[in-house]
Curated annotation (Swiss-Prot):
Origin superkingdom: Eukaryota
Name the UniProt record assigns to this protein: Protein LEG1 homolog
Compartments (UniProt record): Secreted
Family: Belongs to the LEG1 family.
Function summary: May be involved in early liver development.
Keywords: Developmental protein, Glycoprotein, Secreted, Signal
Keyword Secreted set for record: yes
Keyword Nucleus part of the UniProt annotation: no
Main location (coarse class): secreted
Residues annotated as signal peptide: 1-20
Glycosylation site residues: 171
GO cellular component, one term: extracellular space
Length: 337
């Protein structure tokens, strides 16, 4: 438990140091945000259907942008300009994956994401892209099915990747069969959002339940993708997926500025075997420290058989505990500024 606590407080320090670094940022948006579809009519249409290719960066980002637009009214009471919308965590995370080269073909066998003329290509061989598929297409389809966009799910056509087509789902009925728990949790989130009685803490709870559920299938289904990466990057991927469960228990608010700030601590490129944190020379001290913290968490989780996660979930089971934890973020921020 002491090891777990040390990771939590190190990560809290990393988070707040990152917030302090970019608190004056005037552009907390993902790359190519303005070039991504803002409304469904910005996508190509065929036979009355909107055609979305999630293997093109801007097409996939467009699904997030539309979700942010369509759900803005439900977050207006929590702050201006949609900044408090909890869905910001998804496009900002996807944008970091793109900017750091993690959506490109890790095998090097194609130009996808690796050459200028293929810069928007999202590779089906990318572990990050495959995991993110279930954090983009699934919530989007669940939102459409929940009436958020005002159109029928039958009006959406999701295009398949060039290979491994059977490892993905493409419409509401198929995804409901393939990942029923995940679809249900995202639908619960969007339906709860539309209730007059919904509140911020309730939204956080539903969001993180859906987010964590979204990783259940792909993290097991795409384990073969680890073979395409260095041991250091593969280990980082495993640790990142583990960390999501701990962040979910703490219900960290994935608002725009918080998420954008936090990501300054994430590695700016794909890791190679010679990278040894905290001594990676082209990474900032913060980025090095985050890698060390994530490794500590991952090792603790694996060595304890996830008992550490159970203990952490029990610790974070009350609103008071979560409030105190979030307050610690603010205290670290105050001392860092």
């Amino acid at each position: 438990m002491a090891v777990l606590a040390s990771w939590v407080w190190v990560l809290a320090g990393c988070f707040c140091a990152a917030v302090a670094e970019v608190s004056d940022s005037s552009d907390p948006y993902p790359p190519l945000w303005e070039d991504s579809p803002e409304q469904l009519s910005d996508y190509m249409m065929e036979d009355g259907n909107y055609i979305i290719n999630p293997w093109v960066y801007t097409d996939r980002m467009g699904m997030y942008r539309i979700l942010l637009e369509e759900t803005a009214m439900y977050f207006a009471k929590y702050g201006p300009e949609n900044e408090q919308n909890l869905l910001w965590g998804l496009p900002l995370q996807f944008g970091w994956q793109y900017q750091s080269g993690r959506l490109a073909d890790p095998t090097g066998m194609t130009d996808c994401g690796n050459e200028l003329n293929e810069s928007l290509c999202v590779s089906v061989d990318s572990w990050w892209a495959d995991i993110n598929y279930y954090l983009s297409v699934i919530p989007f389809l669940a939102a459409v099915d929940s009436g958020i966009t005002g159109i029928s799910p039958n009006q959406i056509t999701i295009l398949p990747p060039p290979k491994d087509q059977m490892r993905f789902c493409y419409n509401v009925s198929d995804c409901q069969s393939a990942v029923p728990g995940t679809m249900n949790r995202w639908r619960d989130f969007f339906q709860y959002m539309q209730l007059n009685s919904s509140d911020f803490d309730g939204l956080l709870n539903y969001l993180w339940e859906a987010h964590a559920s979204s990783l259940d299938y792909p993290t097991s289904a795409f384990g073969d993708r680890y073979n395409f990466y260095s041991e250091k990057e593969a280990n980082f991927e495993e640790n990142w997926a583990i960390a999501v469960n701990y962040l979910a228990a703490a219900r960290l608010p994935t608002t725009q500025n918080r998420t954008y700030s936090f990501q300054r601590g994430l590695p700016p490129r794909v890791l190679v075997d010679t990278d040894i944190a905290p001594f990676i020379p082209d990474f900032t001290p913060l980025q090095n420290e985050v890698l060390v913290s994530l490794k500590l968490l991952g090792d603790t989780d694996r060595n304890s058989g996830s008992l550490s996660l159970t203990l952490w979930e029990n610790l974070m089971s009350t609103k008071l505990a979560r409030t105190l934890f979030l307050k610690a973020f603010e205290e670290f921020l105050a001392t860092s500024s």
